[in-house]
Amino acid sequence: MDGLSFVDKGKIPDGYKNEIDQLVKKEFANIKREPVHPEIRGILAKRKGADNSVSTLTNALYTEYLKQRNNKKRRTPDFNDDDDTLFLEEYRRKYPRIDTSRYIPNESSEVSLLGIVDSYLKHQEIVLDTLLPQTVSNQWRINNDYIRQTCTIVEEMNIQQRKQINDLEIYRKRL
């Protein structure tokens, strides 16, 4: 971090700079960094297949489970009659990327938290749908340029080594 020359009359002591660097590193280490979401490939492939996005979750999902609840043939021995629990179980089955284990049914704050997570993931999908196509072509250009440069370097090394081998063969014949 640098000082402002028009505010700071003297040089900032190195101790302060080091302390700021340590605080920044400490805060950066505390940030929970997660790898790329495991279903990004699925989101990208979604354009070609059926729409399985979170936005397709409608009241039909909830009513479907109300119907299943009343279907005694489909009930299991440990069947839970709570509509909200059924809804969360179906949500968990259809959208495994959302961890619903921390949500407690019948509490409005927890349901709103699920809505927040749902909105956040929808935002991620929108960003991937709109921004990724713009950046992928640039990434391929950079990758192709890198591969061309690497191929040129390898070819030059190959030519140089062949020349050295030929020189060595000529030297051996002279001996």
Curated annotation (Swiss-Prot):
Protein name per the record: Pre-mRNA-splicing factor SNT309
Alphabetically ordered keywords of this record: mRNA processing, mRNA splicing, Nucleus, Spliceosome
Gene that encodes it: SNT309
Record's subcellular location: Nucleus
Further information: Present with 721 molecules/cell in log phase SD medium.
Domain of life where this protein originates: Eukaryota
An annotated GO cellular component: U2-type catalytic step 1 spliceosome
Described purpose of this protein according to its UniProt entry: Involved in pre-mRNA splicing by stabilizing the NTC (or PRP19-associated complex). As a component of the NTC complex, associates to the spliceosome to mediate conformational rearrangement or to stabilize the structure of the spliceosome after U4 snRNA dissociation, which leads to spliceosome maturation.
